[in-house]
């Protein structure tokens, strides 16, 4: 059976532009990158994180003062990969706005919340889900014990990130993330994950 990612990439449209040197073609994502738009779609894993981090660093080098827009539609994924993106978002000089289209679950919700203050958005029918990290380990009892300690440390760190960006107390975050907690866009706004639910581009431009 063909990999669905390969199928999707084969269907990526090309955009043709006229330049002084003739025609030039881009895949649609490269063309949007010229407009400082990055797409974070699908599971968060190391390869995807590397691409997103590279694009963030490239856009910083192009113009360290101009905003970068990160569009998120992700079910979440690997915590370490997500934290690599998070750290890069905080590291670079340009403000990073975030917009959830579709869903932002697990690490996707953390990256949505990590956008620049007053620049975190979601579309009306998007879905956001937060929860504590999970893991499955096997091996010697002492190794399982070490992994358990590490995942608890990771849980505390993720909770602290939500506290920082959502304006909630640590106890509120811990209670909400204890199980899978699904939110509508309006509920995410009330919880502090986003700053505005938007229905048109004019709403975004009005806040810039």
From Swiss-Prot:
Record's Gene Ontology CC terms? cytoplasm; endopeptidase Clp complex
Asked whether the keyword Hydrolase is assigned, the reply is yes
Location comes to: Cytoplasm
Q: Which InterPro entries match?
A: ClpP, ClpP/crotonase-like_dom_sf, ClpP/TepA, ClpP_His_AS, ClpP_Ser_AS
Where is this protein primarily located?
A: cytoplasm
Keyword Cytoplasm tagged: yes
A Pfam family it matches = CLP_protease
According to UniProt, the reaction catalysed is: Hydrolysis of proteins to small peptides in the presence of ATP and magnesium. alpha-casein is the usual test substrate. In the absence of ATP, only oligopeptides shorter than five residues are hydrolyzed (such as succinyl-Leu-Tyr-|-NHMec, and Leu-Tyr-Leu-|-Tyr-Trp, in which cleavage of the -Tyr-|-Leu- and -Tyr-|-Trp bonds also occurs)
Keywords on this record? Cytoplasm, Hydrolase, Protease, Serine protease
User: Catalytic site residues?
Assistant: 106, 131
Q: Name one GO molecular function term.
A: ATPase binding
In the record, biological process GO terms are: protein quality control for misfolded or incompletely synthesized proteins
Which EC number(s) does UniProt give? 3.4.21.92
Function as written in the Swiss-Prot or TrEMBL entry: Cleaves peptides in various proteins in a process that requires ATP hydrolysis. Has a chymotrypsin-like activity. Plays a major role in the degradation of misfolded proteins.
Q: Family membership, please give it.
A: Belongs to the peptidase S14 family.
User: HAMAP family per the record?
Assistant: ClpP
UniProt subunit comment: Fourteen ClpP subunits assemble into 2 heptameric rings which stack back to back to give a disk-like structure with a central cavity, resembling the structure of eukaryotic proteasomes.
Q: What is this protein called?
A: ATP-dependent Clp protease proteolytic subunit 2
Gene that encodes the chain: clpP2
């Amino acid at each position: 059976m063909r990999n669905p990612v390969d199928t999707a990439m084969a269907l990526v449209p090309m955009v043709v532009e006229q330049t002084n040197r003739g025609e030039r073609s881009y895949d649609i994502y490269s063309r949007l990158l010229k407009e400082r738009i990055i797409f974070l779609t699908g599971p968060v894993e190391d390869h995807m994180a590397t691409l997103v981090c590279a694009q963030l660093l490239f856009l910083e080098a192009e113009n360290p003062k101009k905003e970068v827009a990160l569009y998120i539609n992700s079910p979440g994924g690997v915590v370490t990969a997500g934290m690599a993106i998070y750290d890069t978002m905080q590291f670079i000089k340009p403000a990073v706005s975030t917009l959830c289209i579709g869903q932002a679950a697990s690490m996707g919700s953390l990256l949505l919340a990590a956008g620049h203050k007053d620049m975190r958005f979601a579309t009306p029918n998007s879905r956001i889900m937060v929860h504590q990290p999970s893991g499955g380990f096997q091996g010697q009892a002492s190794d399982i014990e070490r992994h358990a300690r590490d995942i608890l440390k990771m849980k505390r760190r993720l909770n602290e990130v939500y506290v920082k960006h959502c304006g909630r107390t640590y106890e509120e975050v811990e209670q909400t993330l204890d199980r899978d907690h699904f939110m509508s866009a309006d509920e995410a706004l009330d919880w502090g994950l986003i700053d505005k639910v938007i229905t048109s581009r004019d709403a975004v431009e009005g806040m810039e």
